[in-house]
């Protein structure tokens, strides 16, 4: 939401000029953007954690403005230039490719009836373990065919009671059934959660032995992982989550520090919805191979682990080049001079890398980082820095879709406008190579919707109007900006998105509505106090309290969190239902972007205070390599 200011602007007609000279003009603009002193000499100052009050400043143009007190950019050029490129030598890629071939051979040996590496007493669990391992180690993109073949085999033996460890093992097995339920669901197989009923006692409760063995703990750990892939109305999954959570927390008090305890702590902390793939890979590399309850040949574990480490480290050389490119873009459009705003382009790139580490997805990673950064800058302009008159000019200028429209704008807005304009055209050129159609008008409409939603919030502040919860949420689903940060980068991926599929996954489809609603609600529960301190009264919390007189703030937050949990189960169902007509792989990128933002709001507004959890995420996933 925006600062409401009645500062008059010169309203005379803006004379639109040609594109000639705009490049020179942008350089001049960077020298005249209001400087509020958040950075000194191009260096970051110590981050400020205070988000509790509004700061009023008088900028160089003499207009009193608000700033949010956000800490400055944490990652300067020196940080980026210091990143390792020691694994870009061709020999590492050649070694990784040889290992990929060896692992494919291992998949083949498992698929052979009565093969030397498996038996009919454990072949189902072995297949599931292989699929689960390559996914958690971040190398699954190399083994799509092997994964599909393995899961087809497991599914052919699936029963209403689940499965045993092998096709001839006789009795069903909790570990194999829970891992199978989770893995098969995530790959679009129709499997019922009622298989878990067969692991409850006559009282309808999950049971455990008096002595917690490592094998039983791992059984329950996979039960916990499965319980998170829940659909609406699945009470058995709720019961499984409650039981397994209590069991694992109790186990942590009894077992010594180990790879198993580290894995339990990690999964209890991040579950599925805030568990980013590359972040999990970094954890799993450290603990992989310590499971002594399942007899897998040492050679298989050794090869999988070596390949995972190589792929993790090889990616770092690409990261450095992409971050250097991103930093040049950030400086070329004069963003460092916009000192009143948050600068989180490196953090956004990291989040993209955590869900898309395939080298060929460079356009996705950079596109996501750029769009998120621009949406953040615009959010800070509309929320605090801009006057109402300036915001109206910016919104109107964008809808004219003419670079000469920047003549009408205050200097600090001109570079932002050109960054958005150029980025849409650049993305459109990349997308057209893949999609075969011009996405400019499609992208413009989504940007226009964002500008309109921000303006609506600004008008609410201007008039002192507090909307109803429903009214606020309908607008907030758009103003959050998640559609934009998803749509354009998605269109640069290497698969076509025809209109039929876009209608199923883009806003306002039910799938995308759920994503937008959850993120708006989750973001509000973490941001509403800081927003209110900056003069932004309307949030899902305050609007819910308006609709329910007498309810406390704490109860309102709890009700919204409960709503988020219910909507999340609906989202699970929308993502994984086999009858949707849209491949899960298409929806998975949308869903993973949702997980990225969900992670960012897990503890606080991690995009405003990025110096804690997300800073650590940058360090462990894109800065540091793993020892071979």
UniProtKB/Swiss-Prot annotation:
Top-level taxon of the source organism? Eukaryota
Q: Tell me where the sequence motif DDXXD motif sits in this chain.
A: 379-383
| Entry EC number(s) | 4.2.3.-
Pathway as given in its UniProt record: Terpene metabolism; oleoresin biosynthesis; Secondary metabolite biosynthesis; terpenoid biosynthesis
The cofactor binding remark recorded in the entry reads: Binds 3 Mg(2+) or Mn(2+) ions per subunit.
Q: Which InterPro entries match?
A: Isoprenoid_synthase_dom_sf, Terpene_cyclase-like_1_C, Terpene_cyclase_plant_C1, Terpene_synth_N, Terpene_synth_N_sf, Terpene_synthase-like, Terpene_synthase_metal-bd, Terpenoid_cyclase/PrenylTrfase
Molecular-function annotations in GO: magnesium ion binding; terpene synthase activity
**Location(s), subcellular:** Plastid, Chloroplast
Cellular component per GO, a single term:
chloroplast
What EC class is this?
lyase
Is Amino-acid biosynthesis among the key words of this record? no
Q: Which residues participate in Mg(2+) 3 binding?
A: 531
Q: Which residues bind Mg(2+) 2?
A: 379, 383
Q: What is its main location?
A: plastid
Q: Which residues bind Mg(2+) 1?
A: 379, 383
Q: Which UniProt keywords apply?
A: Chloroplast, Lyase, Magnesium, Metal-binding, Plastid, Transit peptide
Instruction: Name the coenzymes or cofactors required.
Output: Mg(2+); Mn(2+)
Q: Does the keyword DNA repair apply?
A: no
What does this chain do?
Monoterpene synthase (TPS) involved in the biosynthesis of monoterpene natural products included in conifer oleoresin secretions and volatile emissions; these compounds contribute to biotic and abiotic stress defense against herbivores and pathogens.
Family stated for the protein in its record: Belongs to the terpene synthase family. Tpsd subfamily.
Q: What is known of its domains?
A: The Asp-Asp-Xaa-Xaa-Asp/Glu (DDXXD/E) motif is important for the catalytic activity, presumably through binding to Mg(2+).
User: What name has this protein been given in UniProt?
Assistant: Monoterpene synthase like 2, chloroplastic
| Source organism per UniProt | Pinus banksiana (Jack pine)
